[in-house]
Amino acid sequence: MGFTADDCARCRADFPALRTMHGGRSLAFLDGPGGSQVPLAVIRAIENVYATCNVNTGGQYPPSREIGRRLHEARRAVAALLGAAGPESISFGQNMTTLCFSLAHAIGRTLSAGDAVVITELDHEANRSPWLMLRERGVTVREVRLRASGELDLDDLASMIDARTKVVAIGASSNALGTVNDLELARRLSTEVGALLVVDAVHYAPHFAIDVQRLRCDFLLCSAYKFYGPHVGILYSRPGALERLPTDRLSAQNPAPPYRFETGTLNHAAIDGVRAAIDYIAALGRGADLRARIVDAMHGIGAYEHALAADYCRRVAALPGVRVYGPGFDRTMRAPTVSITLDGRHAGEVAAALGEQAICVWDGDFYAVRAVEVLGLAARGGLLRTGFSLYNNREEVDRLLSALADIAR
């Protein structure tokens, strides 16, 4: 049956933040790419940890065993979300950026001067800066060109992957333009030369079903706060991949995956919130097991968001002085993220005007600094970005378009 406007209406009641008012108007959170709101189930899960088992793991008493069980269940839930073989492939961290720096540092210790890493001009800096730092070790970093269409130059990608390439680091979807990259091509090219494939799925995970086993990536990173959870970073490691890396850890720390990449005491309450967020998504789908329900739900949610974003994109493009950036919505694989500029207007000025009308959108480069530079938009304040989540509806789209029409006059 998919995910419908009626489903959206029911879900909206689950998100307390949607009842927040500003100037007599309810806030329209159209800033999903920057982070989603959380349902009450996630809030209660976090609260329950602090109320009942706010202790460390590994103890010989009930609350310690309980929090250990919850962390295992959270890994199991993330494994189901990503299509991983099991919870031992799932590591948690402070955020995706910190995990990617740790991953790049560990991989970098295995590389030699003259080895090459491939990144892209389209990616968020969290999947660029950690790899660019490897230049200090004599590693060559090659950057795949971004075309004016908002898509990567795939011929350029193919030309950069050769026998010296040890890592291909690529985003699944652009947080600035909504572009969905050709991961199957990246995987095929990297496999041909024996390079590691590292995927940034932060902007992809909230909108599409992920199957890491089908993709056959070596590492995949995402962030729970983009899919209705708390601020927790997630690292998937292909079985056998993490064990080969030299990691910074305490001598007393468990060296086995998934603990090999986890330092100190984790944010137990937030991690249980991740589990609750995934359970919330799964409850919106149908299937015989958790994985099947997640996939079904993501297909429905993604189609709903795509239709909402496509309608907004078509209508906003018709406003005077508006230019839309990124691929069109005539394709199915397009994230529900729409970025625009208005002639003669700084993106921050427009975002502030919308904010006063209780409409939450984002402006700037969104840490996709290089992409905004390549598009020649840095001096204009970057882009005005709108992103849709499962709780957004057509009434909010109409509010946004009406406000933009007034600003564009």
Enumerate the predicted regions with their spans.
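Pyridoxal 5′-phosphate
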Residues: 1-409
